Amino acid sequence: MTLFVDDDDKAYHIYSSEDNSTLHISQLSENYLTHSGKYKRFFPSKFNEAPTMMKTSSGKYFIISSGCTGWNPNAARSASAKSIFGPWKELGNPCVSRDSLTTYYSQSTYILPVQGIKDAYIFMADRWKPENPIEGKYIWLPLKIRDDKLVELEWKEKWDLSIFNN
């Protein structure tokens, strides 16, 4: 699950529900402490979890999530919408390089906007180690937006914020 605060200061709780079969977006109250009662179900029976959300400067929303395979890594899933409540369009796996079918052996956890750089985002993910959970790690990768239509994640052994200047 994740929380997302839109540029109008409205907050949303995005989570997997119905035995992990369906994602929900629920608007929170003005003080962010309870659900407002306004919500939307999407991708019923698709079994997504670990949703993350971002909004581009053009106003388009993107979600990256994971399939429900327990400790086993799987291909990420992405979707876009012009409104937070949809309709949402499935875009497929945003990962484009080696180990893309395992989301680089990780699962989405958050998308961090880079302050001071327009439409620059960092994809943050958990890398689980079921045999020794204390050894779990995190990966951070630059997230590219292609023509405001697709998001793309490419594995980088090393990178810094200058990657967003290209």
Report each predicted region and the residues it spans.
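Carbohydrate-active catalytic/glycan-binding domains of CAZyme proteins
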Residues: 1-166
